[in-house]
From Swiss-Prot:
Belongs to the RecF family. The keyword Membrane does not apply. Disulfide bonds: none annotated. The RecF protein is involved in DNA metabolism; it is required for DNA replication and normal SOS inducibility. RecF binds preferentially to single-stranded, linear DNA. It also seems to bind ATP. It comes from Chloroflexus aurantiacus (strain ATCC 29366 / DSM 635 / J-10-fl). SMART domains: AAA. It is found in: Cytoplasm. Its main location: cytoplasm. GO terms for cellular component: cytoplasm. The gene is recF. This is DNA replication and repair protein RecF.
Amino acid sequence: MYVHHLFLRDFRNYRRLDLALAPATTLFYGPNAAGKTSLLEAIFYLATTRSPRLSSDRELVRWDAVGEAGTPPFARIAADVERRIGPVRLEVLVQRRADDDGQPLNGAQKLVRIDKRPARAIDLIGQLRVVLFTPTDLTLVDGPPAERRRYLDITLSQLDPHYVRTLAHYQKILLQRNSLLRAWREQRRVPRHVDAELAYWDQELAAAGGYLLAERLRAIVELNDLAGPLYQEMSGGEDRLQIEYAASCDLGTARDAGGLAERLLLAFAAQRSDELARGQTLCGPHRDDLIFTVAGINLGRYGSRGQQRSIALALKIGEAGLMRRRSGEAPVLLLDDVLSELDAQRRAHLLALIHHPDQQTLLTATDLSDFSADFLAAVRRYRVEDGQVFAG
């Protein structure tokens, strides 16, 4: 799998870009704020429908972009992707919102096309699989639980169309259930009506949550197999890394979706009074976490910076291995100025992944001196300056 062509219009600081890409390694270099990261962001967005940097799509549209025929400005991101199952054209238009008088509103709207046919944003996910490495990956280890849930969800959503749809369904049900719990707490609903409605939402949430849990637990088994030995090598012979799934409720020994759904129903019943008092759902996949241990020590809490960096890198390389193992194709690797952050040993492990046959890697750097002459001779290079890309 690789991106054959990337097209941008009014995206970030790019007015226009039409760039052919090789199926091997491409290095984009140049000063900060030149647009290097935006190239990787565009490809990540096509794969996941979200930016790794922003909460609002509105900011993706170039600040001085002009709309056509009185319409609000928009950004266009498109790519031709070569895959084992056949080529595909992916395209997203992100348009700023405006009122009837043309005055800007908050937010943006998306128009998605797959092979030039209109599609839903959710249908885009999994058409192109990517793994993004950034200097902020350390938050996977020492950041809040939401970062680790997001890591799992992005990985599994790209591999399993049913997972991403179930995740979206779960989030909608969760909003409904929380709204009902708050209504009871604020005495806006009759208690007997709340009980009947909660019974319905409990069943719906448990069914969706059971599937999410089953897939997450299966992925953790595989990630332990892939990332555990990598950490051991990078750390110079420390004990093997163990990734533990820290569920917010007692799952018992259940591992299949049906059994896990039953465990969730039991947990909802046990926590009913607390949930009604607090007005929120207190257990489920939306509150779970990952714990990283070596020799029984929680390295997310007590590990050194070097240990935590090794865990983050092992997780990302493990993510790429999981995608290759399940799909039979290597994902596109996006490395945003990360090699300069790594010591020689960690860099060697990442370069070994880059040099794997059939692996497309797109990486950015500010300084070519971070790379050996042999590496620079083996890759395609582009200089990025002020939203323009030049060969060499």
